[in-house]
Amino acid sequence: MAPMGIRLSPLGVAVFFLLGLGVLYHLYSGFLAGRFSLFGLGGEPAGGAAEVAVDGGTVDLREMLAVAVLAAERGGDEVRRVRESNVLHEKSKGKTREGAEDKMTSGDVLSNRKMFYLLKTAFPNVQINTEEHVDASDKEVIVWNRKIPEDILKEIAAPKEVPAESVTVWIDPLDATQEYTEDLRKYVTTMVCVAVNGKPVLGVIHKPFSEYTAWAMVDSGSNVKARSSYNEKTPKIIVSRSHAGMVKQVALQTFGNQTLIIPAGGAGYKVLALLDVPDMTQEKADLYIHVTYIKKWDICAGNAILKALGGHMTTLSGEEISYTGSDGIEGGLLASIRMNHQALVRKLPDLEKSGH
């Protein structure tokens, strides 16, 4: 007697084979959809941070610098256009820790959109952190033409590849929003910074209303330089307009009555004050001090530029700032160039306590 079992005709075998192929196809297409979503083709996550692709290969920092300059300038165009229209659509995002209004305008939003999507389209596999919310429903594809400007090629002759997963981009689409609403245009900047493994390696600070752009890459090149001299004994100290009096009291005790305090808006503007900037609207200072909480997108670009030029930006206790993790720092800020930075840190032991 023949063993019991199921016999399939050739047609049945073919049907089972096709069903198997169908199952495999759906499994594989689902896998691909997941991969594509990681590469930014399936929409942006909520908030100001973009997802990072898994195993994203490498990116060229020289190309990133070229796109960062373009992004800062494109964002600056939006900032200038909105300000000159005199229709800012100003609103408050809430209060800062010091109790001031945290303002936002159409200039912030439109600049953020241009800057974020230009960088995201060019480098879909890197983490991008930005001050303003990224609206996934308002997605825009802005294509970079892959041309590196001659001034960058002149300073940085060769590509510099790094793993995409090691990169974090910090965008400030409009620094000094308070001053922007007051029409104090000289303080306003747009900024882009690239950090690798938390260390700032390239920065761009663009002034939309004078159309000046400073950029630098650590261990590579820059289009800006330090000034020829600085006054370390009785320095001019640039500080935020909101707490100039607080810093002045301690600075006079530390450096003497000849010390000059320069109140100013915008972290980008304050860093440029330490450098040799060919802009008649730019004030000059020897030190930049900040004594309260500050966000990393405000300072990363300036930190990278100072570092590339041999300068320093640390907390008030002298600690290096890591551009990973949280989006702010608690320990205040001290920035200098061509000075004994650690000696300055030791001179200012009480400033951080004064800021809280």
Swiss-Prot record:
- Name the Gene Ontology molecular function terms of this record: 3'(2'),5'-bisphosphate nucleotidase activity; 3',5'-nucleotide bisphosphate phosphatase activity; 3'-nucleotidase activity; metal ion binding
Q: Which SUPFAM superfamilies match?
A: Carbohydrate phosphatase
For the ligand (Mg(2+) 2), the binding residues are: 172, 175, 298
Question: According to its UniProt record, where is this protein mainly located?
Answer: Golgi
Which sequence ranges are listed under topological domain Lumenal?
34-356
- Binding, AMP: 240, 243, 266, 270
TM regions (residue ranges):
13-33
Binding, Mg(2+) 3: 131
> Would the keyword Metal-binding be found if you checked this record's keyword annotation?
yes
Q: What is this protein called?
A: Golgi-resident adenosine 3',5'-bisphosphate 3'-phosphatase
Q: Which organism is it from?
A: Rattus norvegicus
